[in-house]
Regions:
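Long, contiguous internal "core" modules enriched in hydrophobic/ aromatic residues
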Residues: 3-6, 10-187
Length: 188
């Protein structure tokens, strides 16, 4: 697991240095373009591995019953896709992404938002919890003293409003980058 995290960090740092050096003219931009796709593929695999490894680390926290869910690895992969694509859409305010990348990120972000909402609700209401303590904690979150944070924050501001902004962006080409950046900020 540690090697996955170190590999992901290394690939990310190399990519950042390479793109920065090309942007500043220290290296040929053709070199950056030539290694961009291999770095993307390797980085994506390592990012997904990092999300799954993080879920397994959470699962080892025996005192945290809410983290003892079989959905956790898939949920963290979905959230990694959601947050990663959202951050890249927000970066699109400052750096041109190109139409193909922009469209792909839009779809990944929108689909990940919907799937994450489904998994969140399924995990809270559709599956038995690991223990009675976890069931009571989940009830406190969804119906008890934390219900406003859950429903207004996690569900409303973290999922529904970003989904509405994604839908609005799909019908508003000129304002799409700003709407998607706002949606991304809300999900992070």
């Amino acid at each position: 697991g540690a090697f996955i995290l170190m590999g992901f960090s290394t690939v990310g740092e190399l990519w950042l240095l390479l793109e920065g050096a090309a942007y500043l003219g220290f290296i040929d931009s053709g070199l950056a373009a030539a290694v961009r796709i291999p770095l993307l593929v390797i980085g994506f695999v390592l990012a997904m591995g990092s999300a799954v490894y993080t879920a397994f680390l959470f699962g080892q926290a025996e005192g945290r019953d809410l983290w003892q869910s079989s959905l956790l690895p898939a949920h963290l992969v979905i959230q990694a896709l959601m947050v990663g694509s959202g951050v890249l859409l927000a970066v699109g305010l400052f750096v041109p992404l190109g139409a193909t990348l922009f469209t792909a990120l839009l779809w990944i972000f929108g689909v990940a938002l919907v799937v994450d909402l489904f998994v969140t609700l399924l995990g809270e209401f559709g599956m038995p919890h690991a223990s009675e303590v976890a069931a009571r904690a989940a009830h406190d979150i969804s119906h008890g003293k934390y219900k406003n944070h859950f429903w207004a924050g996690a569900i409303g501001l973290g999922h529904i409003l970003p989904l509405l902004l994604v839908i609005a962006a799909a019908f508003s080409a000129g304002a799409a980058p700003l709407l998607l950046a706002a949606a991304a900020v809300l999900t992070v």
